[in-house]
């Protein structure tokens, strides 16, 4: 029994000595290379002479990008960011692209550059015409100068009146006609009922406008026309191979007209129209 007690005392003393030897390690006699921890890991030197990497916990890093300075390595709990590598453009030969309007040239990570849309750029609304040799490129491009007037000596223009549409300017060899600013009061203006074609240079404007000349006579060699009188419809012109007959007068309102039963012969120049028409004198 005594021998067993002595053996237990010896074993307990050995354990105490071994624990003390592990806690109090003499690192002066230890040679090792400290490990390089990857980003978001840190070196722990608490219970090791050479240290070991462990994850960073309870560490707050800013969201702002911090680029590494000269010689700095992206390690630690809040590592820096390596700056973008610039290519060696000394041995590169290329033609820089010409960017279209509202695009700009970016030379950040390319030797020849690339075009990218302009963002965050404010341009004035005032028109800036391009100078001699200037090209309309860049974020706020210039406006090309209007071209010279063309040679209109050999350009045939139609004689039909063409009014300018919205936004159209009376320019070019065959310019449009500006819209009349104000229509005249034609309620008391009597107009002749005879068809009047426009003369050269005359425009069908005013209270009694002329009728534009037909642009081209049609080929009526194979057209058969009847002998029946066909009056022109509303807006129809007496043109074409089988022209209509112009309406002499509008149909009057004869609901209140009082006509006699006596025969009334037409006077010279009078035609049998109206509510009480005359009768043509066939004996003359």
UniProtKB/Swiss-Prot annotation:
Record bears the keyword Transferase: no
UniProt KW Repeat keyword: yes
C- repeats by residue range: 145-159, 179-193, 213-228, 247-262
GO cellular component: cell periphery; extracellular region; vesicle
Signal sequence range: 1-25
A- repeats: 25-64, 88-126
GO biological process: actin filament polymerization; cell adhesion; cell migration; cell-cell adhesion; cell-substrate adhesion; chemotaxis to folate; macropinocytosis; pattern specification process
The B- repeat ranges on this chain: 65-82, 127-144, 161-178, 195-212, 229-246, 263-278
Keywords of the record: Developmental protein, Repeat, Signal
Name of the protein in question: Prestalk D11 protein
Lineage: Eukaryota, Amoebozoa, Evosea, Eumycetozoa, Dictyostelia
């Amino acid at each position: 029994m005594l021998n067993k007690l002595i053996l237990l005392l010896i074993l307990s003393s050995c354990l105490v000595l071994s624990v003390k030897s592990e806690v109090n390690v003499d690192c002066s006699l230890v040679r090792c290379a400290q490990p390089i921890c990857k980003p978001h890991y840190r070196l722990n030197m608490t219970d090791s002479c050479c240290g070991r990497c462990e994850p960073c916990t309870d560490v707050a890093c800013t969201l702002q990008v911090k680029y590494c300075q000269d010689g700095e390595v992206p390690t630690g709990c809040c590592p820096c960011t390596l700056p973008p590598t610039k290519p060696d453009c000394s041995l590169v030969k290329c033609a820089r692209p010409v960017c279209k309007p509202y695009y700009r040239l970016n030379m950040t990570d390319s030797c020849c550059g690339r075009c990218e849309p302009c963002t965050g750029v404010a341009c004035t609304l005032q028109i800036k015409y391009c100078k001699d040799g200037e090209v309309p490129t860049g974020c706020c491009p210039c406006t090309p100068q209007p071209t010279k007037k063309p040679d209109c000596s050999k350009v045939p223009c139609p004689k039909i009146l063409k009014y300018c549409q919205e936004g159209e300017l009376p320019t070019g060899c065959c310019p449009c006609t500006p819209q009349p600013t104000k229509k005249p009061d034609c309620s008391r203006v009597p107009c002749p009922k005879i068809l009047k074609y426009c003369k050269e240079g005359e425009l069908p404007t005013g209270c009694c406008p002329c009728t534009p000349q037909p642009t081209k006579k049609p080929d009526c060699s194979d057209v058969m026309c009847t002998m029946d009188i066909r009056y022109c419809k509303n807006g129809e012109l007496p043109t074409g191979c089988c022209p209509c007959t112009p309406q002499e007068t509008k149909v009057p309102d004869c609901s209140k007209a009082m006509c006699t039963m006596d025969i009334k012969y037409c006077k010279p120049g009078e035609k049998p129209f109206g509510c009480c028409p005359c009768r043509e004198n066939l004996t003359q």
